[in-house]
Amino acid sequence: MKIALCSSFVPFVNGGARNIVEWLEIELKRAGHQVERVYLPQVDAPDLLMPQMMAYRWVDLTKLSDRIICFRPPAHLIPHPNKILWFIHHVRVFYDLWDSEYRSFPDDAKHRSFRAALHRVDTSAINEAKKVFTNSKVVSDRLTKYNGIGSELLYPPIAMPERFSSAGFNDEIVYVSRVEHHKRQHLLLQALKYTKSPVKLRFCGKAFNVSYANELRTVVAKHSLNSRVSFDDRWISEEEKIKVLSECLAVAYLPIDEDSYGYPSLEASHSGKPILSTRDSGGVVELVTDGYNGLLVEPTPQSLADAMDRLYLDRAVTMQMGKNATARIKELNISWSHVIDRLLS
């Protein structure tokens, strides 16, 4: 079968939205299909919204592919008689983040009209799909709430999970992610001030917002935490990441209302490490069961500090939660064989 994988991307920004496409391409080719990736750029600037949507609508793959699978918006606008969606999120500033601090434009007549138009167009285009899958219950719930559309949950695996394993438990809680305000690395730093154990933090990831990165370093200096906090202000290699995860105490991932459980959480699970997250972290809560394969706490410094101490001081429980984290993947049937079966059914 000739399959086109259609998605959008933000230039010079790598992350899960690209991984899900590229990793699926590998698995589909392994299954004997012809696969082509189709990308167009997209940014959340309101004045570019409609032109970008039109560009996707004009893409015609009808005679070139037997099926298209669409991921990141507005790729779902591409018309095709055999269109499948693996929908990973909306343009969130016009949906669930409209009333949040992350909307950078005014709530005025102009932008409300953009929002209303986007909702109408999205609903129409999504309804064109033969099947609609999502990467989390969170996203499925948003589709129901905002577009009145039902969907099937299909959790995304990672590439070559057999690369990851546990090599023991050191004193570091590791956070592998882009360094951004909504990923809330600052919460962990604030929590470290209240810990009673000598637990350490390690942040691995690039900061695109320089001011936020500087704020984090200021907190470290102000509270004399230099000996307990390390920053890898870059994208560490896959080999480095595998080693860091294999040796760490636990993995932290606490974004605000995340679209899915996030690849850092899944990589932690394959590495046999418990996940530290918060109850408002969206899709992460679908993967983590508190006290079983990680700890879910309130998004406050003191609650996180208590959890960090627990991970450090009760190593037997920490190790058992790590074993359970690996088992949790099988419990949720997170595998490429399941993904291929559902997307091509």
Which residue ranges define each predicted feature?
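A conserved mid-protein helix/loop that constitutes part of the nucleotide-sugar donor-binding site
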Residues: N19, D171, E180-Y194, N214
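Membrane-proximal helix-turn-helix segments that form the acceptor-binding/catalytic region
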Residues: R103, D108-V132, S140
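Nucleotide-activated donor-binding/catalytic signature segment of Leloir-type glycosyltransferases, i.e.
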Residues: N214-W235
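Short alpha-helical segment that forms part of, or immediately flanks, the ligand-binding pocket
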Residues: I242, S265-H270, V285-E286, Y292
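Acidic donor-binding loop of glycosyltransferase active sites
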Residues: L245-S260
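Short hydrophobic beta-strand element within catalytic cores of glycosyltransferases
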Residues: H270, P274-T278
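Conserved acidic donor-binding segment of nucleotide-sugar-dependent glycosyltransferases
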Residues: D290-G291, L295-P301, R310-R315
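A short, well-ordered alpha-helix in the C-terminal region of glycosyltransferases
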Residues: S303, R310, V317-L332, H338
